[in-house]
From Swiss-Prot:
The modification Phosphothreonine is found at residue 782. One of its GO terms (biological process) is somitogenesis. This is Zinc finger E-box-binding homeobox 2. Interacts with CBX4 and CTBP1. Binds activated SMAD1, activated SMAD2 and activated SMAD3; binding with SMAD4 is not detected. The gene is Zeb2. Residues 12-24 have a biased composition (Basic residues). It comes from Mus musculus (Mouse). The modification N6-acetyllysine is found at residue 377. Residues 437-487 are annotated as: SMAD-MH2 binding domain. There is a cross-link at residues 391, 479, 555, 611, 632, 713, 866 (Glycyl lysine isopeptide (Lys-Gly) (interchain with G-Cter in SUMO2)). Residues 644-703 bind DNA.
Length: 1215
């Protein structure tokens, strides 16, 4: 079969193997095949016959090298190689011999090869030129004839047979001597050139088919390959660089330098090759890392010095690397209001001042209203109405801590801003302000399919807003301590008990603050409020009375639920007795080692180490039903449950709210964060750590408790519904016959009489039936309203809401109290059946409840209620209401309020089954994502299914990632793309923190502050490029690489020099320009314009060439820029000036590229971001568009050729 002639391979490719090892033999006759490492590369340096009887039937692997003495010209000897990728044209040296003679010498080859060479004709010659241009003939026929004639003679004599017999002897050791010169040439990259050895290995009689170079004795199968080899390697002219040892010529000095490395001893050679042939000349004095460019070292030094010269104009975050800054700007990470590191995205550092306010575009309306309040101007009704349409945002926790520290408030409050929540002139705690600050009052309800508010409800809300505005003005005008004057003003209630009167001083005069009413008259707040309250009372009289009958059913269901809970808990106790895990102090049994350890270490009252903590609770507290709760349960409930916050015997009530706030920010703090939290709350670090652990266990047990399934039993249908038929059609939501919310029953009971309220004390989970009865009874006889601001629960299956289930008689007496959140403060049974009050479509203002049946456009919302005044029959109660009957600093959970109905997710976001939080399915407002406040109103349109949001929700509580949730579906999912790697089985769940809270790579010794950084770092090991351009199909490791690459297709150039006006599409190019060319870029721009004018006048020169010639004549090249490099930068034959300009800009094309080992812990993210700027592919793409002009005076003065770039690409895994 005819041997296929292989085409020449591409020239500008890097050889894969740098150090192929070969064996040398003394004589061609004694060559024995050995395995060659370069067989796969198709690199045949010599090919020789096995000298076997039937050579055509034997597979040979010509891997051995002859001694140089075996051939006059080292025919088929060691072939010196170099690793240069570019072989540019040079002048020609003529060297000819007749192909006919060559073919005659090759008579031992197969007939197919003869046909190939006959086709060339006998006149085929090789022309080469010497420096003077003369032509000479070098007849190499004698060399070929001598060798091939000798070979044929040996084959006729049967030497091959004797060699075969000799090799088959078992007592003979075959030694393959190596020539001394071989050591100096091992590892020469040119040994891997497929394009110059087109004969595949193992070809029979392959040696006879080779054409040998007369200069270096390299063998080639085709004459064209030999011509190219001589042309590119052995021509000499004045512009080439010649190797003094082997006479190889190179077009670039850098190629010659790397080639000279191959002549060094093996140890030195390996060291220099690994160091990039000495190109990394800039070494860090701190850590010893070396860099090729001086500006790379400069930016690296900022890691050690902490300098961060780049600052984001939006969030004021600073960066040490321009690449990090560019990535931050490009990814729009600071668009939202909450940033990664606790910074408000409004140009104000959070926590810098208690007066810090939000000034982002989304809060522009709030800012305008705040300015009016600061100037003492009353708000018009239109502005007050506009406040209702301001979307609320989460308040940064740093602001929250500063506010508490400044004003001395220890309790927690709903952690939101919006309305006037975060825009108070004095930064007063948000709970003292707008009652609607907890929810998105102004959400575009029609967009989500809900009707708008009716005018009646709007009027009531306006009253509340006016009160808030005036309170804010009063706080602005008065000193901080003067706010206490507002605490004593309450309407007297004759039903209150005498001890309640001692809470506030009755001698404090009323504070009458002026406010503008509808008719423009100035009234006091009290008069105006009471007037509107009376109007709202009239609205309540239209409510139905069917809810009375539902109360009894709800009470019965609650009793059954509590019985089930107590029974299940007793069963759990009995089960734990039989387990072998018992406490060494109190001998109490536990189902496993983990609960046992937690009990022994932190909860056991017999443990001496925690007796001091439990000292206030040494006495066992009996409840009404005789169920005793020991100290352990008290501590557990005080630590885990919110119901302990208001207990008079809870010593930690001043700390729990702060702990909950920290817990909502980060559920798994490391040791450093725990220390900070313990200092902030004033508790021991071990206590804080255990609190976090118990909190997680508590929530997990609530979500997994099997006993909660029993709460899903439907309640009995209402036996005597007496709903007014005239009101039912106007209800926005049809009442449900079989299921009603227990919260509704509590609402009815809370306003029917004026008994003192029963404050929930710390109690165990075993709360008996009698206590519940007493609780319901006291609620049914109390004028002090219940709190409905946080009736959410994670433990209910059956709760539903009935908008028409409130009777006017029961609801018209007293307003609801929002100061006592119920979430996790009540016994399990109550919590399990009390979770849907938010959707009951009722809005109360002070003493008023406006029925949704009166407002058919949109269901009302109980979460808009804030009790600020009582009616004239109300005395001061024990709720510690400091401001108009409300305690603004009472303890509340971090995210108490549920979202308004207008903020519910679209239908596609409703989960089919709630698995992790049972019982939340019937009520959309209790969806899991609602517990994260900004997720309550940011349902991006880009994500079409609940599965998309479910995927995002995995990371919603991770510290530093909440800000990305505000950026919408596309940006947030792109952030998750960088954080997850399903193909390589890398997920956040599998990444474990070290003891110091860092994330360590399991393949190297690097650690990172964020798991996402570690996942991106893993790309360096796996080589995966997950981000692919859809236009040119190039792939990148990081998304911001793809973002900047896409600008090459779109033509976008967002970066512009303010001096010369030049624009850049890549941040790395822009940074390099500003760092090294800014000082003279204006002059360069003027020179470029002059060169263009001159080119237009001459008509035959390119402006770039003129500019370059002028630059060299002016000697503006920096030191170290050698003549050879000048020649490199000059245009060469066959290249257009445009290509020359692009190639000259290669020195800047590799901007900001850093090796993978350059990333530091402190600036790991910035180093990754910077890698975009240094990605050679991306920068080279930009250069192909002609973005850059040639800069010949770079500060570091190191221009690299295309071969340098490709080699570096291989080093950094970028190719």
């Amino acid at each position: 079969m005819k041997q296929p002639i292989m085409a020449d391979g591409p020239r500008c490719k890097r050889r894969k193997q740098a150090n192929p090892r070969r064996k040398n033999v003394v004589n061609y006759d004694n060559v024995v095949d050995a395995g060659s490492e370069t067989d796969e590369e198709d690199k045949l340096h010599i090919a020789e016959d096995d000298s076997l009887a039937n050579p055509l039937d034997q597979d040979t692997s010509p891997a051995s090298m002859p001694n140089h003495e075996s051939s006059p010209h080292m025919s088929q000897g060691l072939l010196p190689r170099e690793e240069e990728e570019e072989e540019l044209r040079e002048s020609v040296v003529e060297h000819s011999w007749h192909s006919g003679e060559i073919l005659q010498a090759s008579v031992a080859g197969p007939e197919e090869m003869k046909e190939d060479y006959d086709a060339m004709g006998p006149e085929a010659t090789i022309q080469t030129t010497i420096n003077n241009g003369t032509v000479k003939n070098a007849n190499c026929t004698s060399d070929f004839e001598e060798y091939f004639a000798k070979r044929k003679l040996e084959e006729r004599d049967g030497h091959a047979v004797s060699i075969e017999e000799y090799l088959q002897r078992s007592d003979t050791a075959i030694i393959y001597p190596e020539a001394p010169e071989e050591l100096s040439r091992l590892g020469t990259p040119e040994a891997n050139g497929q394009e110059e050895n087109d004969l595949p290995p193992g070809t029979p009689d392959a040696f006879a088919q080779l054409l040998t170079c007369p200069y270096c004795d390299r063998g080639y199968k085709r004459l064209t390959s030999l011509k190219e080899h001589i042309k590119y390697r052995h021509e000499k002219n004045e512009e080439n660089f010649s190797c003094p040892l082997c006479s190889y010529t190179f077009a670039y000095r850098t190629q010659l330098e790397r080639h000279m490395v191959t002549h060094k001893p093996g140890t030195d050679q390996h060291q220099m090759l690994t160091q990039g042939a000495g190109n990394r000349k800039f070494k860090c004095t701190e850590c010893g890392k070396a860099f090729k460019y001086k500006h790379h070292l400069k930016e690296h030094l900022r890691i050690h010095s902490g300098e961060k010269p780049y600052e984001c104009p939006n969030c004021k975050k600073r960066f040490s690397h321009s690449g990090s800054y560019s990535s931050h700007i490009s990814s729009k990470k600071c668009i939202g209001l909450i940033s990664v590191n606790g910074r408000m995205r409004n140009n104000i550092k959070t926590g810098s001042s208690p007066n810090s306010v939000s000034s982002s575009p989304t809060n522009s309306a709030i800012t305008q209203l705040r300015n009016k309040l600061e100037n003492g101007k009353p708000l018009s009704m239109s502005e007050q109405t506009g406040l209702l349409k301001i979307k609320t945002e989460p308040l940064d926790f740093n602001d929250y801590k500063v506010l508490m520290a400044t004003h001395g408030f220890s309790g927690s409050s709903p952690f939101m801003n919006g309305g006037l929540g975060a825009t108070s002139p004095l930064g007063v705690h948000p709970s003292a302000q707008s009652p609607m600050q907890h929810l998105g009052v102004g959400m575009e309800a029609p967009l989500l399919g809900f009707p708008t508010m009716n005018s009646n409800l709007s009027e009531v809300q306006k009253v509340l807003q006016i009160v808030d505005n005036t309170v804010s003005r009063q706080k602005m005008d008065c000193k901080t301590e003067d706010i206490s004057k507002l605490k004593g003003y309450h309407m007297k209630d004759p039903c209150s008990q005498p001890e309640e009167q001692g809470v506030t001083s009755p001698n404090i005069p009323p504070v009458g603050l002026p406010v503008v009413s509808h008719n423009g008259a100035t009234k006091s707040i009290i008069d105006y409020t009471l007037e509107k309250v009376n109007e709202a009372k009239a609205c309540l009289q239209s409510l139905t009375t069917d809810s009375r009958r539902q109360i009894s059913n709800i009470k019965k269901e609650k009793l059954r639920t509590l019985i089930d809970l107590v029974t299940d808990d007793k069963m759990i106790e009995n089960h734990s007795i039989s387990t072998p895990f018992s406490c060494q102090f109190c001998k109490e049994s536990f189902p496993g080692p983990i609960p046992l350890h937690q009990h022994e270490r932190y909860l056991c009252k017999m443990n001496e180490e925690i007796k001091a903590v439990l000292q206030p609770h040494e006495n066992i507290v009996p409840n009404k039903a005789g169920v005793f709760v020991d100290n352990k349960a008290l501590l557990l409930s005080s630590v885990l449950s919110e119901k302990g916050l208001t207990s008079p015997i809870n010593p930690y009530k001043d700390h729990m709210s702060v702990l909950k706030a920290y817990y909502a920010m980060n559920m798994e703090p490391n040791s450093d964060e725990l220390l900070k939290i313990s200092i902030a709350v004033g508790l021991p670090q071990e206590f804080v750590k255990e609190w976090f652990e118990q909190r997680k266990v508590y929530q997990y047990s609530n979500s997994r408790s099997p006993s909660l399934e029993r709460t899903s039993k439907p309640l009995a249908p209402n036996s005597n519904p007496t709903t007014k038929d005239s009101l039912l059609p106007r209800s926005p939501v049809k009442p449900m016959d079989s299921i009603t919310s227990p919260s509704i029953a509590e609402l009815h009971n809370s306003v029917t009489s004026c008994d003192p309220p029963l404050r929930l004390t710390k109690s165990s989970h075993f709360t008996n039936i009698k206590a519940v009865d007493k609780l319901d009874h006291s609620r049914s006889n109390t004028p002090s309203p219940l709190n409905l601001s946080s009736t959410s629960s994670k433990n209910s299956h059956s709760s539903s809401y009935t908008p028409n289930s409130f009777s006017s008689e029961e609801l018209q007496a007293e307003p609801l109290d929002l100061s006592l959140p119920k979430q996790m403060r009540e016994p399990k049974g109550i919590i399990a059946t009390k979770n849907k009050t938010k959707a009951t479509s009722i809005n109360l203002d002070h003493n008023s409840v406006s029925s949704s049946s009166e407002n058919s456009d949109e269901p009302l919302n109980l979460t808009f209620i804030k009790k600020e005044f009582s009616n004239s029959n109300n005395l001061d109660n024990k709720s510690n209401n400091p401001v108009f009957g409300m305690n603004p600093f009472s303890a509340k959970p971090l995210y108490t309020p549920l979202p308004p109905q207008s903020a519910f997710p679209p239908a596609t976001f409703m989960p089919p089954v709630q698995t992790s939080i049972p019982g939340l399915r019937p009520y959309p407002g209790l969806d899991q994502m609602s517990f994260l406040p900004h997720m309550a109103y940011t349902y991006p349109t880009g994500a079409a299914t609940f599965a998309d949001m479910q995927q995002r929700r995995k990371y919603q509580r991770k510290q530093g990632f909440q800000g990305d949730l505000l950026d919408g579906a596309q940006d947030y999912m792109s952030g998750l793309d960088d954080m997850t790697d399903s193909d390589s089985c890398l997920s956040r769940k599998k990444i474990k923190k070290t003891e110091s809270g860092m994330y360590a790579c399991d393949l190297c010794d690097k650690t990172f502050q964020k798991s996402s950084s570690l996942l991106r770092h893993k790309y360096e090991h796996t080589g995966k490029r997950p981000h692919q351009c859809q236009i040119c199909k190039k792939a990148f490791k990081h998304k911001h690489h793809l973002i900047e690459h896409s600008r090459l297709h779109s033509g976008e150039k967002p970066y512009q020099c303010d001096k010369c006006g030049k624009r850049f599409s890549h941040s790395g190019s822009y940074s390099q320009h500003m760092n090294h060319r800014y000082s003279y870029c204006k002059r360069e721009a003027e020179e470029r314009e002059a060169a263009e004018r001159e080119a237009r006048e001459k008509g035959h020169l390119e402006p770039t060439e003129l500019l370059m010639n002028r630059a060299y004549l002016q000697s503006i090249t920096p030191q170290g820029y050698s003549d050879s490099e000048e020649r490199e930068s000059m245009p060469r034959d066959g290249e257009s000036e445009k290509e020359h300009e692009k190639e000259g800009e290669e020195g800047y094309g590799k901007l900001r590229r850093r090796d993978g080992d350059e990333e530091e812990e402190e600036e790991e993210e910035e180093s990754e971001n910077k890698s975009m700027d240094t990605d050679p592919e991306t920068i080279r793409d930009e250069e192909e568009t002609g973005d850059h002009s040639m800069d010949d005076s770079s500060e570091d003065g190191k221009m690299e050729t295309k071969s340098d770039h490709e080699e570096d690409n291989m080093e950094d895994g970028m190719e």
